[in-house]
Amino acid sequence: MATKFPKFSQDLAQDPTTRRIWYAMAMGNDFESHDGMTEENLYQKIFATHFGHLAIIFLWASSLLFHVAWQGNFEQWIKDPLHVRPIAHAIWDPHFGKPAIEAFTQAGANGPVNIAYSGVYHWWYTIGMRTNTELYTGSVFLLLFASLFLFAGWLHLQPKFRPSLAWFKSAESRLNHHLAGLFGVSSLAWAGHLIHVAIPESRGQHVGWDNFLSTAPHPAGLQPFFTGNWGVYAQNPDTAGHIFSTSQGAGTAILTFLGGFHPQTESLWLTDMAHHHLAIAVLFIVAGHMYRTNFGIGHSIKEMMNAKTFFGKPVEGPFNMPHQGIYDTYNNSLHFQLGWHLACLGVVTSWVAQHMYSLPSYAFIAKDYTTQAALYTHHQYIAIFLMVGAFAHGAIFLVRDYDPEQNKGNVLERVLQHKEAIISHLSWVSLFLGFHTLGLYVHNDVVVAFGTPEKQILIEPVFAQFIQAAHGKVLYGLDTLLSNPDSVAYTAYPNYANVWLPGWLDAINSGTNSLFLTIGPGDFLVHHAIALGLHTTTLILVKGALDARGSKLMPDKKDFGYAFPCDGPGRGGTCDISAWDSFYLSLFWALNTVGWVTFYWHWKHLGIWQGNVAQFNENSTYLMGWFRDYLWANSAQLINGYNPYGVNNLSVWAWMFLFGHLVWATGFMFLISWRGYWQELIETLVWAHERTPIANLVRWKDKPVALSIVQARVVGLAHFTVGYVLTYAAFLIASTAGKFG
């Protein structure tokens, strides 16, 4: 007899109801729970999947290169990056009528195409690519690389090539490999690429496979490097009049510290970026060699964690940093590790979103407004999912892997012991921010509605303005630090030698970029609304994790696992308190918050890009301003994507906007109705099916049963999330592209 799905659980495979399918989908990634799983096998399987993951990434990048080379307009775009719109790929759609074909035949193409809003054109141009042939070459290289990684994944599942458990648990060796080998060496390689290929190309000198070994990146060669005269590499940088990709105004420097932006491309200086990557490489290669591996030198992390000394002095009592037992706790729990990794990656992804627009690194991308908006929004959305996932796996760690004996007296136990103080403080700050921020918005809304806008309560963000002034913004007249030429920040080494400072001060005070935007009362309010969202999301997640093992209401909660709906009517009030439920609730708040973040960023930038900052400044201080002047006003073009007179090239976004709303609203059907309703409905449908001629020829083996409460919540949450993302993505791209192309 054929074995039934799922193979990883005999219990589920023998379930006679449709529960078999749903539970199998839910448990597919929970490798720990699979039949016959050992710790060693678990590590080996996860290790092998990393190669598959990398193969998918390389395949994806290869497909971008291939489609742009085949169907894009890269060679036309680089001749005029500010006015030619980059093509992602052609569209083949047999349903298109003549008006649609005309609407989507754009950007100089001879058939319907999609426009690229990902920034890949700017990236490839900046790093030295100039022809379709180079794109094809890169595509084939990445395809071969993907194949190699797929093979490596398969190989590491073969008995002879499976690493042992001890190999996986050698933390110092892994740090050595990741810090020095991956981060350090790849940064060094990237610095090498920028110096040997990208910088010469930016100065009009082609470097390819044919001549890169014979073309020296600097006239002085390696002599300054070996004689310690490194300053030579910073002399004669590109001038302010440099025309990108030509020799006009070009210098010879390869490692500089100019600060600010290239005047023509409005992106960071390539020579500054090469310097940055070289510095990162040195730091990480050193960092990777600090820990004790096979040679008996360097730090042992376990010894450091367990030592009760701080810089050689013994520390005891409440103010020490008790990490005893943490090494083994971390090293033996994949959920603990994953929680940390997701948290770090989440922070850095949000950080990338902030830096990609304020300090653009790719040539001319600062003037491709739709791409800027898409990249910011994309990275902030990714960040919230990673952060919520971090807390989810932290909670699973506390339920499944935390050992109270092993962690006696260390920081983990301390956090659990004073969880009431942590949770109540988060609750207090959420209430404070919520009532005060909403109070100000509602007050302002009411007085504006009654025709007395002068009665609004408008608060200048003086502390934030002070921080901007300290970094050199002179607009506010707060002469302090870098905005005061006489201050020590201005005159201290190395600034007196005019290193980096002039470029930075020009950039921060220019008004045409997104560096340290001018802020006022509208920013003050929305900042606190975002703070409310962040703190409430954190409250839900932290409470869920810290109460995951047990609470006063349910002391034995850990015995019920990570996700349970309720413990029946016998213990009233145990519904909604599993750690999974806190993950579920927090995601609504996380989406709410990222909505406010992206609304704020987008509306503020629309004003800057259109040269009309007054609209945001005057109308962001009350609720109707946000609804009317941001959401409603900017969806006007969108809902006109197609009308009785035909279609335009926004029609696909108009359709997606409607479809996103539909998916989002469908979520509530699962979120607001409970299991009994669906069970009755299914039984009625089965009854009807079995009595309908022809239809009743189709039978099924599994008895149809409704989703469990937790599963229905997952389905509802998935629809809510996907609909939310689709709706805002369509709104963002259409409202920006409709104005700026």
Swiss-Prot record:
Its main location: membrane. The keyword Metal-binding applies. [4Fe-4S] cluster binds at residues 566, 575. SUPFAM superfamilies: Photosystem I subunits PsaA/PsaB. It is an enzyme of class 1 (oxidoreductase). It is found in: Cellular thylakoid membrane. Keywords: 4Fe-4S, Chlorophyll, Chromophore, Electron transport, Iron, Iron-sulfur, Magnesium, Membrane, Metal-binding, Oxidoreductase, Photosynthesis, Photosystem I, Thylakoid, Transmembrane, Transmembrane helix, Transport. GO terms for cellular component: photosystem I; plasma membrane-derived thylakoid membrane. Its EC number is 1.97.1.12. It comes from the Bacteria. Phylloquinone binds at residue 678. It catalyses: reduced [plastocyanin] + hnu + oxidized [2Fe-2S]-[ferredoxin] = oxidized [plastocyanin] + reduced [2Fe-2S]-[ferredoxin]. The chain crosses the membrane at residues 46-69, 135-158, 175-199, 273-291, 334-357, 373-399, 421-443, 524-542, 582-603, 650-672, 714-734. GO terms for molecular function: 4 iron, 4 sulfur cluster binding; chlorophyll binding; electron transfer activity; magnesium ion binding; oxidoreductase activity. GO terms for biological process: photosynthesis. It is a multi-pass membrane protein. Chlorophyll a B3 binds at residues 669, 677. Chlorophyll a B1 binds at residue 661. PSI electron transfer chain: 5 chlorophyll a, 1 chlorophyll a', 2 phylloquinones and 3 4Fe-4S clusters. PSI core antenna: 90 chlorophyll a, 22 carotenoids, 3 phospholipids and 1 galactolipid. P700 is a chlorophyll a/chlorophyll a' dimer, A0 is one or more chlorophyll a, A1 is one or both phylloquinones and FX is a shared 4Fe-4S iron-sulfur center. The keyword Iron applies. PsaA and PsaB bind P700, the primary electron donor of photosystem I (PSI), as well as the electron acceptors A0, A1 and FX. PSI is a plastocyanin/cytochrome c6-ferredoxin oxidoreductase, converting photonic excitation into a charge separation, which transfers an electron from the donor P700 chlorophyll pair to the spectroscopically characterized acceptors A0, A1, FX, FA and FB in turn. Oxidized P700 is reduced on the lumenal side of the thylakoid membrane by plastocyanin or cytochrome c6. The PsaA/B heterodimer binds the P700 chlorophyll special pair and subsequent electron acceptors. PSI consists of a core antenna complex that captures photons, and an electron transfer chain that converts photonic excitation into a charge separation. The cyanobacterial PSI reaction center is composed of one copy each of PsaA,B,C,D,E,F,I,J,K,L,M and X, and forms trimeric complexes. Belongs to the PsaA/PsaB family. This is Photosystem I P700 chlorophyll a apoprotein A2 1. It comes from Nostoc sp. (strain PCC 7120 / SAG 25.82 / UTEX 2576). The gene is psaB1.
